[in-house]
Amino acid sequence: MPKQIHEIKDFLLTARRKDARTVKIKKNKDMVKFKVRCSKYLYTLCVSDFEKADKLKQSLPPGLSVQDL
């Protein structure tokens, strides 16, 4: 089941959880979507600023598998 996260801090906390498995990054022409798969939900964060998206991609946990779509 999907859930949307609106704050970057909340997304980073969710990505650092023990049950977080993968992060998928989808790029459109006007926004970047970060999707983290946890055991129960698929959490989505939509970022319209591409510079913030690059910083967020660099600050993801290193043990998490990241896929660019």
UniProtKB/Swiss-Prot annotation:
Coiled-coil spans in chain: none
The membrane spanning regions, by residue number, are none
Molecular-function annotations in GO:
structural constituent of ribosome
InterPro entries tied to this protein: Ribosomal_eL38 (IPR002675), Ribosomal_eL38_sf (IPR038464)
Which Gene Ontology CC terms are recorded? Answer: cytosolic large ribosomal subunit
- What keywords would UniProt list here? Ribonucleoprotein, Ribosomal protein
- Record Pfam families: Ribosomal_L38e
GO BP annotations, alphabetical order? protein-RNA complex assembly; translation
Q: What is the similarity comment for this entry?
A: Belongs to the eukaryotic ribosomal protein eL38 family.
What name is this protein filed under? Large ribosomal subunit protein eL38
Q: Which organism is it from?
A: Solanum lycopersicum
* Upper classification of the organism: Eukaryota, Viridiplantae, Streptophyta, Embryophyta, Tracheophyta
